[in-house]
């Protein structure tokens, strides 16, 4: 039974502590849109998305009004387009036409972003998947709200180094194609290892082939709430600290569960999962970095940062999992540098480095996220960063990802501005020692020994 104190507490979370639902994401299966004719495929995709998602935005807004819970984004994910377009796309330009169809459909229904311009190449690339990857510079520079991801490895299959090597060049080309807006195209692309099928967050969201025809997934966001709760834990031991985070995560997730069930009921589409992730914004007081500093670090990146993040991540999961019937997606703490005020400050001061962020990715939700690097960083260095991160995911049986932005024309110490939720970031130094001979060997890195469970 709810008591009046808990009601006031939830109101306070929303009004003062920046609790919000980061996204209601509708996943839509497009396998029934496959045809051998490009224009037919584009029309089928447009019609299905605009039919299924026509009420998504208005439903989200009505839930906001009825419950007083801010819902920041409404998004769509679709079946990886490399699969959908394989029959009709004979060139990279053909895939770009599908990207335009996705962009038009998403704008018609009024969502913020659409994800799923994706390829799953954890073992090897088909010709269609390679065409889609090569189409990315044009697709991401010519569209506004289409997001893309490529899964380059998994614990079961190893890492496809051919696609990793290719992506280094592609990311450079995306950066060049959007050089006039601080290489913003790279913000809409992420390379994954062990990508989940039900991720509601961008840029890595896609509607996996294991999913049904349509589904509602919800991502919550509450670092500000956790930060405020930790004020009461100052000077207390780890048991009290963990209990505080756990209880707070439960309350945050309960809000997400309510929104997910209500959206599912109103739209007539099954509820999929709640993603438990703590997703920051560039606003003051809405920072995962601030939470880590309240745990006891002078600044993010100090010794102890990885341990503090591991503990935070675990307690968020332990608290959140009891509050939802289905948990999935990425579920943990996000550490996107440009989207987190305290991390931006730590990166600027030099306390937070890419190497430290890589260590942090071993214990948190995703990987090297929203990191601006010098525009003259070589393609092989970017491939090496992706390979390192994929190896962490592969060996530790977790999702890892890389979203780096080589900002054309800028170097260490300058600032890149991406705007809105994407924030701004100092250009961070990258180790310039060459790994070209390694990433150009060709072939794949085998799956680790502990992946053989049968």
From Swiss-Prot:
Listed Pfam families: DUF711 (PF05167)
InterPro entries hit by this protein: UPF0210
Alphabetical list of NCBIfam families matching this protein: PRK05313.1
Family, as annotated: Belongs to the UPF0210 family.
Quaternary context: Homodimer.
Protein name in UniProt: UPF0210 protein BLA_0552
Species name: Bifidobacterium animalis subsp. lactis (strain AD011)
């Amino acid at each position: 039974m709810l008591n009046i104190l808990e009601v006031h507490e939830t109101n306070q979370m929303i009004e003062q502590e920046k609790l919000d639902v980061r996204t209601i994401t509708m996943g839509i299966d497009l396998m029934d849109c496959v045809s051998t004719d490009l224009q037919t495929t584009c029309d089928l995709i447009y019609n299905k998305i605009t039919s299924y998602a026509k009420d998504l935005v208005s439903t989200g807004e009505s839930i906001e009004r009825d419950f007083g819970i801010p819902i920041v984004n409404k998004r769509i994910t679709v079946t990886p387009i490399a699969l959908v377009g394989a029959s009709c796309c004979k060139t990279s330009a053909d895939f770009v036409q599908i990207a335009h169809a996705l962009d038009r459909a998403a704008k018609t229904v009024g969502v913020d972003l659409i994800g799923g311009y994706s390829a799953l190449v954890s073992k090897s690339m088909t010709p269609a998947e390679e065409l889609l990857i090569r189409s990315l510079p044009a697709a991401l520079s010519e569209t506004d709200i289409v997001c893309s991801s490529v899964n380059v490895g998994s614990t079961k299959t190893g890492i496809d180094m051919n696609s990793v090597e290719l992506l280094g060049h592609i990311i450079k080309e995306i950066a060049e194609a959007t050089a006039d807006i601080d290489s913003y195209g790279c913000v809409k692309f992420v390379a994954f290892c062990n990508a989940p099928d039900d991720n509601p967050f961008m840029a890595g969201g896609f509607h996996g082939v294991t999913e049904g025809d349509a589904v509602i997934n919800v991502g919550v966001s509450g670092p500000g709430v956790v930060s405020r709760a930790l004020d009461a834990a100052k000077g207390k031991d780890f048991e009290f600290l963990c209990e505080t985070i756990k209880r707070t995560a439960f309350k945050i997730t309960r809000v997400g569960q309510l929104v997910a069930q209500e959206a599912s009921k109103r739209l007539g589409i099954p509820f999929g999962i709640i993603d438990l992730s703590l997703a920051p914004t560039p606003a003051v007081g809405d920072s995962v970095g601030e939470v880590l500093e309240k745990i006891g670090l002078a600044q993010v990146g100090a010794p102890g940062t990885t341990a503090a993040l591991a503990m935070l991540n675990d307690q968020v999961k332990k608290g959140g999992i009891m509050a939802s019937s289905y948990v999935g997606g990425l579920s943990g703490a996000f550490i996107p540098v440009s989207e987190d005020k305290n991390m931006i400050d730590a990166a600027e001061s030099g306390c937070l480095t890419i190497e430290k962020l890589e260590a942090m990715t071993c214990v948190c939700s995703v990987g090297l996220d929203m990191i601006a690097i010098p525009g003259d960083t070589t393609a092989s260095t970017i491939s090496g960063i992706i390979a390192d991160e994929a190896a962490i995911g592969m060996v530790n049986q977790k999702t890892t990802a890389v979203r780096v932005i080589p900002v054309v024309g800028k170097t260490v110490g300058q600032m890149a501005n991406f705007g809105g939720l994407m924030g701004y970031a100092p250009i961070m130094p990258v180790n310039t020692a060459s790994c070209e001979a390694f990433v150009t060997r060709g072939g794949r890195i085998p799956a680790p020994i502990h992946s053989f469970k049968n």
